[in-house]
């Protein structure tokens, strides 16, 4: 950790709270951050710190390390807004919202009322066979080979297959979609990020306009029937929701899968627990969501407020640092241990009114991936000679993961 120069410190921020954290360096490191950087951070930082590099582009914001403090914020949409949180539109000089993620009440309530039934548990359960088949097709391509590039051959393709199926978008453009997604979510360069946002917007708007003219039974066509404030959704709202599905569906599960399968490859004996007691898979997924959560998201202070006695000014960013809060020793007993029978909750899929819209699908994807790998393959491990690297930043993941078995 490094102390930031005084020139970057607002007047209301005490010097002793200002830090620059390696956890948000947005680069590859050789040591697993869940075993090094995060426990060190929990042991040394106060409950609230002003981190100079916490937001993409090395922009500052407040880091909360406490689970309870973060949950209190998530339950308080009056004081902590999400309006424009990701700066996606602002990055390209526009003002649309990512829907429902960047909307606030009361319109957020109306958006979720229209969307929640479409992502309800029973709706997602109806996709189970389709999701399982997607997993099996990918696994069958490498299971007899004895090794795989897990990220390239499975974790990038599997959740994207499912989102593209849902939106009825062409599977043969997956590589291009992935390139755009990485340029948006894994760069520190705002020009690169903005160029990718423009490409995604241009593509999605073309699809939306075509579906508006020639509707089918796909999800995008159905969005036009959604109502808000007594009217149908407009094209900008339909786009804002499709953009939400694009950035959410193309990355979060991919990053989680890489983190999970890296852990199981480094500690193969933990696979044996799940093979011997497959009933643990459901709770194991929840524990992985706690221990290997990838995303640091944010809220924006809507007004002057205090957290732990520290003044927060309107417009300042406050973290929802799920990788960090999952290791809060004041909330979790022995947080450094991955325990498949742990029952404690987590906030890796959000909380409050902004609980993840796709959480039931995400859980199902993770559970099925584990079930199918454990069924199809013998015990896997990190491939001989392969050195795992970990990307630290706002979406923590393993960029490559070579596994072998047999």
Model-derived segments and their meaning:
Residues 1-406:
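Cytochrome P450
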């Amino acid at each position: 950790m490094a102390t930031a120069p005084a020139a970057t410190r607002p007047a209301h921020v005490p010097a002793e709270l200002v830090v620059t954290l390696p956890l948000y360096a947005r680069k590859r490191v050789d040591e697993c951050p869940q075993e090094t950087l995060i426990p060190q951070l929990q042991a040394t930082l106060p409950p609230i710190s002003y981190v100079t590099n916490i937001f993409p582009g090395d922009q500052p914001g407040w880091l909360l390390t406490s689970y309870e403090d973060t949950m209190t914020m998530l339950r308080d949409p009056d004081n902590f807004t999400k309006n424009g949180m990701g700066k996606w539109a602002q990055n390209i000089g526009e003002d649309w919202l990512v829907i429902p993620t960047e909307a606030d009440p009361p319109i957020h309530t109306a958006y979720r009322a229209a969307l929640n039934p479409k992502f309800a548990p029973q709706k997602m359960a109806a996709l189970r066979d389709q999701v399982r088949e997607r997993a099996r097709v990918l696994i069958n391509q490498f299971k007899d080979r004895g090794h795989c590039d897990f990220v390239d051959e499975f974790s990038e393709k599997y959740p994207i297959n499912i989102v593209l199926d849902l939106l009825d978008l062409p599977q043969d453009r997956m590589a291009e979609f992935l390139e755009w997604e990485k340029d948006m979510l894994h760069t520190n360069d705002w020009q690169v990020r903005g160029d990718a946002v423009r490409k995604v917007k241009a593509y999605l708007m073309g699809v939306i306009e075509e579906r508006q003219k020639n509707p089918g039974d796909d999800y995008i066509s159905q969005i036009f029937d959604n109502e808000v404030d007594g009217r149908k959704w407009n094209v900008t709202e339909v786009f804002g929701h499709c953009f939400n599905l694009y950035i959410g569906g193309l990355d979060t599960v991919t990053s989680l899968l890489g983190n999970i399968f890296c852990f199981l490859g480094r500690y193969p004996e933990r696979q044996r627990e799940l093979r011997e007691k497959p009933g643990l898979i459901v709770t194991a997924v929840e524990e992985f969501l706690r221990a290997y959560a990838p995303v640091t998201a944010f809220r924006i202070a809507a007004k002057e407020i205090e957290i732990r006695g520290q003044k927060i000014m309107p417009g300042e960013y406050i973290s929802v640092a799920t990788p960090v809060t999952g290791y809060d020793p004041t909330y979790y007993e022995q947080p450094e241990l991955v325990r498949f029978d742990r029952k404690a909750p987590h906030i890796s899929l959000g909380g409050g009114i902004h609980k993840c819209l796709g959480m039931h699908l995400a859980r199902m994807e993770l559970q099925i991936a584990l079930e199918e790998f454990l069924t199809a393959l013998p015990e896997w491990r990190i491939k001989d000679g392969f050195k795992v690297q970990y990307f630290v930043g706002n979406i923590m993941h393993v960029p490559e993961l070579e596994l072998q078995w047999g």
